[in-house]
């Protein structure tokens, strides 16, 4: 019986060996090897695309791209070199000269309604325009479907220079996710649409709008950190971002020692959702940005036919500077601010700080020039910049001290004259 088993085993082994070394088996091995190699190539390509998310939003904005992607110059910066060539043929642009901030607000609101079927309250448009005068970063936050991205897109459309919409990706962590990186294998720089627009803006007087769509799906303080730091520099001529670590003779003319100038005519508008899929925005970002809350849809209204506006960034900044001179915050409200600052320091160990005071002194005059009133502007910016800081307080202490703060606001500014501040305090009370 044992001999029969051994004989059967040997015979089976021989058959297996014959199959393994048959032509069919060899071909199967070859096809399997080809399949493995193909899988590796596909895996590498997928990871390359993940590393270069700019390819996604380049396609998203392809209709706004007027240059070709050829690389006849031999430069490692294909798109930027094309801009250098194309700018020589650009025709001069005639900009509007006689216009006011209030007119801009009304015309933009009417244009969005008539041409784009987007409806916004005039107060929100005033806050939007005044916010742009304070910071190069404006955050639009609120419930989904309230028109955050649409508002930012409409602003670029109204200004005759379409906004560049960049869908932020969850894995973004650094500057290269926004502007691209140098590919050692191809010896080319993987340029993004944002890099192209930044380079183009340095040649132009137009207002450029970059929309960071769903900006807090990744940590803003990570991927936008260098932008925030550079924007803090008081002199716009010193605002440069690193692109590459060295300089090549064939590099585009606008790059200085591998750095690109952050254009003073570019604004960043981020849209933010507050849900489980997003990160909270840090104080570092909030302190440097302006915020507009869009929490409800506006009613439809009749809007007359309104033309687009051609206004230079220089003219827009001139209008804001004129507003600051003509509508400086009243001494009475300055005294109220000082008193509120003392109250908050005593009861909550929170203070305004120089940055917030500077923002207040810009925001209020511009909001007034947009057609609003001083106290409404003060209520709005205090609720976002000062009262919001109380969210970090001990919940039990905050709940017990909230009524005293609301009473003090009534005493200082008049009963129910600060509705936005009191509404935010009440919301914090409920969440405590």
Name these PLM-found stretches:
Residues 1-23:
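Short, strongly hydrophobic alpha-helical membrane anchors
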């Amino acid at each position: 019986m044992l001999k029969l088993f051994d004989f059967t085993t040997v015979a089976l082994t021989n058959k297996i060996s014959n199959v393994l070394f048959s032509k069919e088996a060899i071909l199967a091995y070859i096809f399997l090897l080809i399949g493995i190699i193909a899988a590796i190539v596909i895996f590498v390509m997928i990871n390359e695309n993940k590393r270069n998310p700019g390819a996604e939003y380049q396609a998203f904005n392809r209709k706004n791209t007027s240059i070709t992607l050829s690389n006849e110059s031999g430069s490692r910066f294909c798109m930027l070199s094309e801009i250098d060539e194309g700018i020589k043929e650009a025709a001069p642009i005639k900009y509007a000269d006689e216009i006011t901030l209030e007119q801009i607000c009304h015309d933009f609101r009417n244009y969005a309604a008539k041409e784009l079927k987007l409806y916004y309250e005039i107060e929100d448009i005033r806050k939007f325009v005044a916010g742009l005068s304070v910071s190069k970063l404006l955050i639009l936050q609120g419930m989904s479907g309230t028109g955050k991205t649409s508002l930012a897109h409409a602003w670029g459309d109204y200004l005759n220079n379409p906004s560049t919409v960049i869908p932020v990706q969850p894995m973004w962590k650094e500057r290269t996710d926004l502007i691209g990186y140098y590919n050692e294998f191809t010896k080319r720089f993987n340029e993004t649409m944002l890099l192209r627009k930044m380079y183009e803006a340095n040649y132009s007087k137009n207002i450029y709008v970059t929309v960071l769509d769903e900006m807090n799906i990744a940590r803003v303080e990570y991927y936008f950190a260098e932008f925030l730091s550079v924007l803090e520099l008081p002199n716009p001529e010193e605002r440069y971002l690193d692109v590459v670590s060295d300089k090549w003779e064939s590099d585009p003319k606008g790059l200085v020692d591998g750095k690109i100038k952050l254009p003073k005519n570019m604004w960043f508008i981020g849209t933010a959702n507050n849900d489980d899929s997003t990160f909270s925005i840090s104080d570092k970002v909030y302190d440097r940005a302006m915020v507009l809350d869009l929490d409800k849809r506006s009613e439809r209204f009749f809007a007359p036919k309104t033309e687009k506006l051609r206004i230079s960034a220089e003219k827009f900044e001139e209008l804001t500077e004129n507003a600051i001179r003509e509508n400086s915050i009243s001494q009475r409200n300055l005294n109220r601010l000082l008193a509120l600052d003392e109250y908050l320091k005593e009861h909550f160990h929170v203070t305004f700080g120089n940055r917030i005071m500077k923002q207040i002194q810009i925001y209020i005059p511009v909001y007034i020039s947009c057609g609003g009133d001083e106290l409404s502007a003060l209520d709005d910016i205090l609720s976002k910049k000062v009262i919001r800081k109380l969210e970090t307080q001990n919940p039990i202490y905050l709940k017990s001290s909230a009524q005293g703060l609301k009473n003090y606001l009534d005493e200082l500014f008049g009963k129910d004259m600060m509705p936005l501040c009191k509404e935010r305090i009440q919301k914090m009370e409920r969440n405590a």
